[in-house]
């Protein structure tokens, strides 16, 4: 939808979280390796909130504890240690992680801290075994340049990544500690972003700077974007976990739609003098004979059915606030997160789900529900139902006040769902187990003297030096394989850089689309491919099949792959002999069409010779031999 974002007073700020490709984790010597094989063991923990020195309990932490969840942590004996399990003090900070943080800070024109103090930031969702995340403030007050103008960068922090979530059950969450402790940069911008397109461009530019260092991890889950969004007469909403750059624009658009819609609902509710009745009524007996599968299942498991009355809410609960999501979805999210229930029913959508019109009539009569009123009902265990309906009552009251400040989860369709309230501001405490780090002028000077080439500079050089067209050069500059491309192009000057770039960018993607696991392919494999090509062991047409061969047989050498694929390179004499045979086999066509038979013959030659001889040599030889026959 097209909005006048300036008129709406849209303000957006980004938090970019980028994993670093360091030799070890931030506070221990374990490798930064993510695994998917069976873990060697598990531990269980329950985290409880405690008062701060000021006597306060963080509201987000308190809310999390009310879910009564236990946390299960998977570990590996050979790639994780007691530091991740919070049974051993942290080691000194990984020095290469600090250097990368300073390098990125310099590229974003930031002011460095003289001394870096490690801090503890409260974490309330169980994603850190200790209940806090270690983080350190490195720099502040910088900016990035974009086509929309400069965007301020508030701060850059170096911190440890959280555990990897494995499973989320009703009364537990399972994590793996293999990701915990991987060095992570947190880059926070000022709320200078004033349109969805500008938000996407800002995130793209920060990502470009990060990749330019060559010291960050690549792939799904290695970079995550949180987006803070607000409009005039709205509220600040923090959207967590946007992994796809292309989704940022849609997330912002849909959140603006949501806030506008919620404001419209508020105005309508106020006109109606709407009221939320606090009383929760037991309607188990009323619906004990229902044929609704959901309600019957709850009753069978010794659950209850309870309901609340929302006066003046008729038609409002079913009102859309985001594409495919309604005010009722907002209520349901609260009930699911805070009560642990599967969902709720409301009279705006009934009769439905096996609940009959007769049952709806009885329900409305029992609840004293008027024409403009609505009823919400929930079925589950008694304690869950109570928690869920109390959460819905609170959210319904908020809908008459305005838009609540929340942390919300990014969904794949560009919408968001409730996660938790915005956390309190005072969640940082000094880390007592790790000494501070002094940032010297000598260190900063060394960083400034070794800054990487920026992508826009590299693009110009690739077009000029390697004669790539601009589109391919752009792909290569942003590619994970950019360093390998340069290395191979310089090492094997006999091969055109365009072929190397196309192989790394296009051929590998095509092979992946065919269902082969290109992650099994190492740089050593690719080195062998181009080395063999430069030594005339194979033709360029053989490259895709040889790469597939390495994926299928990762331990084999090039000569073995060529043998398996039947692509050992032929001599010129062998090629000439095969082409002569093909011409003789099709002599009737040659006599009839002369040089017009070239297309047919070329197809038949390639069928026999593809991968065994260069296509140009085949073409040239065929033309020569065909001319001799025609003459």
Swiss-Prot record:
Keywords attached to this entry: ATP-binding, Ligase, Nucleotide-binding, Protein biosynthesis
Protein EC: 6.3.5.-
UniProt superkingdom: Archaea
Catalysed transformations (reactions): L-glutamyl-tRNA(Gln) + L-glutamine + ATP + H2O = L-glutaminyl-tRNA(Gln) + L-glutamate + ADP + phosphate + H(+)
InterPro entries given in the database record: Asn/Gln-tRNA_amidoTrfase_suB/E, Asn/Gln-tRNA_Trfase_suB/E_cat, Asn/Gln_amidotransferase, Asn/Gln_tRNA_amidoTrase-B-like, GAD-like_sf, GAD_dom, GatB_C_1, GatB_Yqey_C_2
Pfam families reported in the protein's UniProt record: GAD (PF02938), GatB_N (PF02934), GatB_Yqey (PF02637)
Cellular compartments per GO CC: cytoplasm
Self-association and partners: Heterodimer of GatD and GatE.
Protein name from the UniProt record: Glutamyl-tRNA(Gln) amidotransferase subunit E
Protein source organism: Methanococcus maripaludis (strain C6 / ATCC BAA-1332)
Gene that encodes it: gatE
């Amino acid at each position: 939808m097209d909005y006048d974002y300036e008129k709406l007073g849209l303000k957006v700020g980004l938090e970019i979280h980028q994993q670093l490709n360091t030799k070890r984790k931030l506070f221990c010597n374990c490798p930064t390796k993510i695994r998917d094989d069976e873990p060697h063991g598990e531990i269980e923990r329950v985290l409880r909130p405690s008062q701060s020195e000021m006597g306060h309990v963080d509201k987000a932490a308190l809310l999390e504890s009310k879910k009564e969840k236990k946390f299960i942590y998977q570990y590996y004996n050979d790639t994780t240690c007691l530091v991740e399990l919070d049974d051993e003090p942290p080691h000194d900070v990984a020095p290469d992680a600090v250097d990368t943080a300073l390098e990125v800070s310099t590229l974003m024109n930031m002011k460095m801290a003289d001394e870096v103090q490690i801090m503890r930031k409260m974490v309330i969702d169980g994603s850190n075994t200790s209940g806090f995340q270690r983080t350190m403030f490195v720099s502040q007050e910088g900016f990035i340049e974009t086509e929309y103008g400069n965007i301020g960068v508030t701060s850059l922090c170096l911190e440890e990544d959280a555990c990897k979530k494995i499973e989320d059950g009703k009364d537990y969450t399972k994590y793996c500690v293999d990701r915990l402790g991987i060095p992570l940069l947190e880059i926070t911008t000022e709320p200078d972003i004033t349109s969805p397109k500008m938000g996407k461009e800002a995130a793209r530019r920060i990502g470009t700077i990060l990749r330019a260092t060559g010291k960050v991890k690549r792939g799904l889950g290695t970079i995550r974007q949180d987006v803070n969004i607000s409009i005039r007469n709205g509220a600040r909403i923090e959207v967590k976990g946007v992994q796809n750059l292309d989704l940022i624009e849609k997330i912002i658009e849909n959140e603006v739609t949501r806030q506008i819609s919620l404001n419209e609902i508020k105005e309508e509710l106020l006109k109606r003098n709407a009221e939320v009745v606090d009383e929760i009524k037991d309607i188990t007996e009323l619906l004990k004979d229902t044929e609704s599968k959901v309600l019957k299942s709850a009753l069978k498991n010794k659950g209850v059915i309870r309901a609340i009355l929302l006066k003046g809410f008729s038609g409002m609960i079913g009102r859309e606030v985001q594409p495919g999501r309604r005010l009722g979805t907002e209520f349901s999210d609260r009930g699911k997160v805070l009560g642990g229930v599967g969902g709720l029913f409301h009279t705006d959508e009934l009769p439905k789900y096996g609940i009959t019109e007769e049952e709806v009539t009885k329900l409305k009569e029992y609840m004293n529900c008027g024409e403009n009123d609505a009823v919400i009902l929930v079925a589950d265990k008694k304690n869950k139902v109570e928690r869920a309906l109390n959460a819905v009552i609170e959210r319904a009251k908020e809908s008459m006040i305005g838009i609540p400040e929340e942390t919300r989860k990014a969904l794949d369709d560009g919408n968001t769902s409730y996660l938790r309230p915005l956390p309190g501001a005072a969640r940082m405490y000094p880390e007592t187990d790790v000494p501070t780090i002094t940032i010297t002028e000598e260190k900063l000077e060394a960083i400034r003297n070794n800054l990487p080439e920026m992508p826009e500079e590299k693009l110009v050089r690739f077009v000029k030096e390697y004669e790539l067209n601009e589109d391919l050069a752009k792909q290569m500059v942003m590619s994970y394989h950019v360093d390998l491309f340069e290395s191979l192009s310089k090492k094997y000057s006999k091969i055109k850089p365009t072929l190397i770039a196309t192989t790394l960018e296009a051929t590998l993607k095509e092979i992946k689309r065919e269902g082969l696991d290109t992650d099994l392919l190492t740089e050593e494999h690719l080195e062998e491919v181009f080395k063999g090509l430069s030594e005339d062991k194979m033709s360029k047409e053989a490259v895709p099949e040889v790469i597939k061969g390495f994926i299928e047989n990762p331990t084999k050498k090039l000569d073995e792959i060529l043998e398996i694929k039947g692509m050992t390179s032929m001599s010129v004499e062998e090629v000439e002999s095969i082409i002569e045979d093909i011409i003789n086999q099709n002599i009737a066509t040659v006599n009839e069409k002369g040089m017009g038979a070239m297309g047919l013959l070329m197809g038949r030659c390639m069928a026999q010779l593809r991968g065994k001889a260069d296509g140009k040599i085949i073409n040239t030889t065929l033309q020569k031999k065909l001319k001799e026959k025609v003459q």
